[in-house]
Regions:
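Sec/Tat signal peptide C-region and signal peptidase I cleavage site
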Residues: 16-23
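Loop-centered beta-sheet repeat module
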Residues: 168-191
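Extended hydrophobic/Leu-rich segments
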Residues: 2, 21, 188, 194-198
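Short, glycine-/small- and polar/acidic-enriched structural segments
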Residues: 24-154, 159-163, 178-185, 196-199
Length: 199
């Protein structure tokens, strides 16, 4: 059995944020709503607003890739739990982002196969030629590729659809995909109601 990958979610700052924050009237923060991280208590209590002396505006995102795009567009100043893979990918491409802390370390991602297909780790090659939902450039994507390699599944034969976890869970439920790779509590619960982990 392949071990689940432990993923680190980073707290990242957009370039210039450290110097611009002092003059800003507000700070825009990205976060994952379905991850029960402690910052959400402080968000409700306005603790960050009080500590920073500015209005903190929170925006929920489905993936760390979306957070990165919003930061690069100048719409987001801080990403809370952006995800290791999106952060590293952005840095490798020269993005002016800086990791300031680790938000949470979590047990990463499952790939759920639709119930009724009869596909398990024992006959995973039957996934070849099928459509799967994967949130690309995330730890779920990394885990998917490692699992397929371990199960000797030829990914070049698969149609890989880039979907956020919540959308992937819906596609799994309606039969649009044979497998969906998921992170996040609510999405994993939804996928688990209509499918089972391949490993």
């Amino acid at each position: 059995r392949l071990k689940k990958y432990a993923a680190v979610s980073a707290i990242a700052l957009a370039g210039g944020m450290t110097t611009a924050a002092h003059a800003a009237d507000s700070v825009n923060v990205a976060f994952f709503l379905e991850w029960a991280t402690p910052n959400q208590i402080s968000k409700v209590d306005k603790a960050y607003d009080d500590a920073m002396g500015v209005d903190v505006k929170w925006t929920d995102f489905s993936t760390g890739v979306q957070m990165t795009e919003a930061m690069l567009a100048g719409d987001i100043d801080i990403a809370y739990s952006q995800g290791l893979a999106p952060f590293v990918t952005a840095i490798q491409q020269g993005a002016p982002l800086k990791m300031v802390s680790v938000a949470v370390v979590y047990e990463a991602n499952d790939c759920f196969v639709k119930d009724g297909l009869g596909i398990t780790s024992a006959n995973a090659s039957e996934l070849e030629g099928k459509t799967v939902a994967v949130p690309l450039n995330t730890m779920a994507d990394f885990s998917f590729r490692k699992q397929m390699a371990a199960l000797d599944v030829d990914m070049s034969t698969m149609t890989i659809v880039d979907q956020a976890p919540a959308d992937g869970a819906v596609s799994l439920a309606d039969g649009s995909v044979a497998m969906a790779c998921i992170f996040g509590g609510a999405s994993a619960k939804a996928a688990g109601e209509v499918g089972k982990p391949i490993m």
